[in-house]
């Protein structure tokens, strides 16, 4: 991932886009804080997190620096991150979908820009098309195209999805083309999502038991890594420098190289965990809306733990987790500022964890 920052003096970044329409509850998190009410005309930037509540929706008009003309729709119940890697002729924009659904209609302005949409299991490449990308709380993914075509990949499966077609990936199964034509995209999306929820309800206690096992393990691993990260003197100093707008000097100075080497150890440990954990706890929060208040919440998912008790515990953990994840994302940005706008490798690269590029 690359960010447009100077090492000697912070510079204003170009926006990823501008809010063109908003309704309901929509929040933007930037530099470790949630901004005020989201309004028409607000700019959004690379590394922002955009979250829509169950009544929320936001449409973002893409900035010309992305190399794309068009808009991005973030539907209700969604959490996404915006990523951007600048290049004179082939800038790359990435929408990292944590939960929820997005849609977009884009075309290239000039050169060879790309727009990529991804979650933990599926990557979709776009150059000029109209598409939808939907995740269910169960972890299933639906990708469909209504104009042009999109390339979609997962593990060793690569598919080309033409207009009027879709593909899905269910946890534990391979990405596959759906054997149906899509005439009304929104109706198809809603039916697919409802089918996923009904399948979950049919086996909710067992599914929630698996969520609980994974949540508890990842929660413990996260805080084991987070405590030394949070107490880092280097992180505190970087945050103070950011608040004061201090000049940062050479990215290759011995002192800064030592700082970066220590911080990337913390960042790498947390990233390994959050790549899955952030999605898990946000999906559990979505499932709570489905289960709480129904008879399922009284069923045990393991001896002594009911579905309702587990879901309420996760919801009570969520505010602190949200703050701590935001601090981690802020640290990523502070690192990149001090590393010529780059993390050790682009965050979408498969070889990140093996990199020694500081």
Sequence positions of predicted segments:
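Flexible, surface-exposed loop/linker segments and immediately adjacent secondary-structure boundaries
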Residues: 7-57, 61-249, 253-256, 287, ...
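Long, low-complexity or tandemly repetitive, helically biased scaffold regions used
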Residues: 216, 220-358
């Amino acid at each position: 991932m690359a960010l447009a920052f100077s090492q000697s003096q912070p510079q204003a970044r170009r926006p990823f886009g501008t809010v063109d329409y908003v309704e309901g509850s929509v929040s933007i998190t930037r530099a470790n804080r949630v901004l005020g009410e989201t309004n028409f005309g607000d700019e959004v930037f690379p590394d922002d997190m955009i979250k829509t509540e169950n009544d929320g929706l936001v449409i973002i008009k893409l900035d010309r620096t992305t190399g794309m003309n068009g808009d991005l729709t973030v539907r209700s119940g969604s959490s996404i991150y915006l990523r951007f890697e600048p290049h004179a002729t082939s800038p790359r924009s990435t929408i990292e979908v944590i939960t929820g659904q997005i849609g977009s209609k884009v075309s290239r302005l000039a050169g060879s820009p790309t727009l990529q949409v991804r979650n933990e299991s599926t990557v979709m490449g776009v150059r000029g098309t109209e598409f939808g990308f939907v995740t269910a709380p169960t972890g299933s993914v639906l990708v469909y195209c209504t104009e042009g075509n999109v390339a979609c990949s997962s593990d060793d499966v690569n598919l080309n999805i033409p207009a009027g077609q879709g593909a899905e990936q269910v946890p534990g199964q391979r990405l596959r083309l759906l054997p149906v034509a899509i005439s009304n995209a929104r109706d198809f999306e809603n039916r697919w999502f409802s089918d996923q929820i009904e399948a979950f309800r049919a086996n909710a206690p067992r599914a929630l038991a698996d969520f609980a096992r994974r949540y508890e393990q990842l929660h413990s691993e996260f805080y084991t890594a987070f405590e030394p990260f949070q107490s880092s003197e280097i992180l505190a100093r970087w945050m103070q420098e950011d608040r004061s707008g201090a000049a940062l000097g050479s990215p290759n100075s011995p002192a800064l190289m030592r700082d970066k080497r220590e911080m990337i150890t913390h960042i790498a440990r947390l990233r390994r965990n959050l790549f899955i954990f952030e999605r898990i706890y946000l999906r559990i929060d979505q499932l709570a809306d489905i289960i709480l208040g129904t008879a399922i919440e009284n069923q045990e998912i393991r001896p002594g733990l009911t579905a309702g008790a587990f879901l309420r515990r996760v919801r009570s953990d969520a505010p602190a987790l949200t703050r701590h994840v935001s601090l981690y994302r802020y640290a990523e940005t502070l690192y990149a500022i001090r590393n010529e706008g780059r993390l050790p490798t682009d965050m979408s690269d498969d070889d990140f964890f093996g990199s020694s590029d500081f």
